[in-house]
From Swiss-Prot:
Quaternary structure and interacting proteins, as annotated: Part of the 30S ribosomal subunit. Forms a bridge to the 50S subunit in the 70S ribosome, contacting the 23S rRNA.
Gene that encodes the chain: rpsO
Annotated PANTHER family: RIBOSOMAL PROTEIN S15, BACTERIAL AND ORGANELLAR (PTHR23321), SMALL RIBOSOMAL SUBUNIT PROTEIN US15M (PTHR23321:SF26)
Entry GO terms, CC: cytosolic small ribosomal subunit
InterPro entries xrefs: Ribosomal_uS15, Ribosomal_uS15_bac-type, uS15_NS1_RNA-bd_sf
Protein name: Small ribosomal subunit protein uS15
Keywords: Ribonucleoprotein, Ribosomal protein, RNA-binding, rRNA-binding
GO molecular-function terms, A-Z: rRNA binding; structural constituent of ribosome
Function: One of the primary rRNA binding proteins, it binds directly to 16S rRNA where it helps nucleate assembly of the platform of the 30S subunit by binding and bridging several RNA helices of the 16S rRNA.
Species for this entry: Chlorobium phaeobacteroides (strain BS1)
GO biological process, one term: translation
Family under the similarity heading: Belongs to the universal ribosomal protein uS15 family.
Tagged with keyword 4Fe-4S: no
């Protein structure tokens, strides 16, 4: 299941401040996290879906690099995002 437009705007407003602020690192991490959780649920129902698993691993890698970038640039925002999204270090 893909992320609907309403869910996407809610995430953007929550993490970006306004719906025009889509490029902020926190917003991108939150959107990736939502897509990752949706794909994880899909893979629990369909464990042999290798193409979706590959896409999931690509999303996890992209989110990991964004989290590393945020840690390098602004440690305060990094800690806030980890707390808000319940991500591990």
């Amino acid at each position: 299941m893909s992320v609907t437009k309403e869910i996407k705007t809610d995430i953007i407003n929550q993490f970006g401040g306004s719906e025009k602020n889509t490029g902020q690192t926190e917003v991108q991490i939150a959107l990736f996290s939502r897509r990752i959780s949706d794909l994880t649920g899909h893979l629990k129902l369909h464990p042999k879906d290798k193409h979706s698993r590959h896409g999931l691993l690509k999303l996890v890698g992209k989110r990991k690099s964004l989290v590393a970038y945020l840690k390098k640039t602004d440690i305060g925002r990094y800690r806030k995002v980890l707390a808000d999204l319940d991500l591990r270090k």
